[in-house]
């Protein structure tokens, strides 16, 4: 209801002032979001969630788009999250408050939330109405409304300290409320329903007047007691940077706020009185009708039950019962814990987003549905079990899920399958699809209970046994090219054949030590189906150290090529069989066979002609094979730069050898010698078809080509879904809105004036430079290689619980309530930390100046020591030291670079005295023009100066 009123009011206002700009920005740019909010409002209305809206404090923003930003898309604060609470505690500054009319109309629109309140006082009003005491019911209603109205006035005009003190008295108010209600019950049972009519007023007061005052004071007192529900919503989300949202005197002049807040409270009072009179005019005839039908006896017991229940719920009112009757969820997330959340399908990712980074609405349905139907993927939607309704629907209009599915179930995320790598691999094109074998459908259950299973387990095992034959060659290739796979002791051997795991719970005999699987990032090939990695037991730290010590004793840190060759062969024979004449196992030999030239033994060959298979050349090939094994074995410690350097050197050596060979052949022809015939080289495509790994030289000089082939064959390899979401969120227009409103506005909401000395003013200038330097580091960090989202843990596939495979420290990630919260927390991580160091936001002990005084929120921290010479703390926490020294030395991949979505010119926020609103600008704008008296300490006679404090930097 409040959302609909805000939308109507915003439409009327903008159409009156600038219709062209309104239609372009709000319907063309923000139209889909508005339609989505309307649909969400209809769903919430059908599920009776609007009952909870009536109880909240109704200080909402009149601008529809601002309300949508705060409630659905933008994280309003890191501590409180994207909850509607901050939106209700904020008075809009985006709409000009001309002549104070907007706050007045806003107060009239918000008055129903204070009038229509289900409370103990409301029950008393109905009781007095049932006794045909109309004037008593009116007085009780007015007392209740007046108490609620006074609390709102106290909050708006800066009396939040008084509200906080009253909040600490909530236990006593509840005890008093319960005792008073039980007193009424006692009098009700002993005297009867008409005990109020027999009471007499003190000091000779007229009984009618005394009863009226007593009833009015009763409603007022109970209304204050029941304000603990509102206090909980007021005090709970407070944080140091939200204090100005309550008292509102940090910018502008006092006159502006008096006019703005005064118009709002007047409109709230007028609307409440008018609506209350309308409600009473409807209830009084209804009660008269009920009295004639003699329903007072039945209504009496129900009212008594409601009174006793409502007064016995601490920190909650009747809204707790009406909005949480099914599951009794926590108070802070009653909208987030429902399946009707507007961001229901934000976790779904298009199957082609890894190539385009954007989704085209016109092609989403055409590309997703055939791909889904070809794989027999039909989701099944199940609602909450407590509701008891079920329905099935095809997601024909939604993008298909192509990566790891997650969902918020309660407070945690639950993966849809045991192994995420298996899921996004199985959704690729199945090699057995054209042979008459189909896969079982994927069943998706809402909410928080996803699972993915295969019906034919035998088919999965057979495919695993067939496809695992090439795992050694593939793993070896990936170790050399990608340098992120470390596979040792993958499967057991039985009579020379590689055997797969029959069951996850079966005993798995490993010929090599299992520490190769512990604390390593193991990336499985896409064709490996069975989740056999999770069957390996955990190892204690002591066992790891003992195994590592034993391994070091067996193999010294520095070995010659012959020693390494001997050690490798002795261990490889156990796993892969007897080595061949090249010194390599047979499983690895097929990829290293070189083409021998067909030499005619009868022809005389000049000794000057270089024989490609001479002793030196053969030694070079053997050395190359040993180097390849060394790289494969120690790929974990070989950086990519070393591999690229070796590849370039090897390519240069082969080029020179080819030139020398051609020169020798040319000289032989000039001398009339017979040149041996050689077979023509196969093309690159034929080489790839005949031998996917190619010759040993292709590991080096064709390194980039191999990477392209790998991307074509396995497009999902090594590409995490959160990187796709990062590009999608950063490319959205709301990201810029978030930067302008939530970041710079928070930094700019420093006090507009202070009693400062010259030393304090110098410290202020220092902190201005510090914050500017910090924001410059953020802009450098945006194009840095390190600007990526959370990386998987080192033992990604070894974690027993899929929830533990991401972000070992749980810094942000899955604690965020939405995708935008996740991006916001990751992008601006450390911003508040630096600001708290520069401008201490609370009265806690100052850790950076243990000998200095304590500072408040609006005071400055002392100047840092200059003899240290370390300005690294002004940089972002995730930027390494080498990047700080030379930011432009790194050239990250295009897939890891975040596109800059805003200009490098920072935005400032300030108070415009003409428009009487906070405005965003790229130029320096003073906050106010009022002259402030300044007291200089250290003088016997105060010297008053005129001083103007202006906003001179982007962050203070």
Swiss-Prot record:
<comment type="similarity">
    <text>Belongs to the ycf78 family.</text>
</comment>
<feature type="coiled-coil region">
    <location>
        <begin position="640"/>
        <end position="672"/>
    </location>
</feature>
<keyword id="KW-0934">Plastid</keyword>
<keyword id="KW-0812">Transmembrane</keyword>
<feature type="region of interest" description="Disordered">
    <location>
        <begin position="580"/>
        <end position="609"/>
    </location>
</feature>
<feature type="transmembrane region" description="Helical">
    <location>
        <begin position="166"/>
        <end position="186"/>
    </location>
</feature>
<keyword id="KW-0175">Coiled coil</keyword>
<keyword id="KW-1133">Transmembrane helix</keyword>
<keyword id="KW-0150">Chloroplast</keyword>
<feature type="transmembrane region" description="Helical">
    <location>
        <begin position="137"/>
        <end position="157"/>
    </location>
</feature>
<keyword id="KW-0472">Membrane</keyword>
<feature type="transmembrane region" description="Helical">
    <location>
        <begin position="264"/>
        <end position="284"/>
    </location>
</feature>
<feature type="compositionally biased region" description="Acidic residues">
    <location>
        <begin position="592"/>
        <end position="609"/>
    </location>
</feature>
<dbReference type="GO" id="GO:0031969">
    <property type="term" value="C:chloroplast membrane"/>
</dbReference>
<feature type="transmembrane region" description="Helical">
    <location>
        <begin position="40"/>
        <end position="60"/>
    </location>
</feature>
<feature type="transmembrane region" description="Helical">
    <location>
        <begin position="104"/>
        <end position="124"/>
    </location>
</feature>
<feature type="transmembrane region" description="Helical">
    <location>
        <begin position="301"/>
        <end position="321"/>
    </location>
</feature>
<protein>
    <recommendedName>
        <fullName>Uncharacterized membrane protein ycf78</fullName>
    </recommendedName>
</protein>
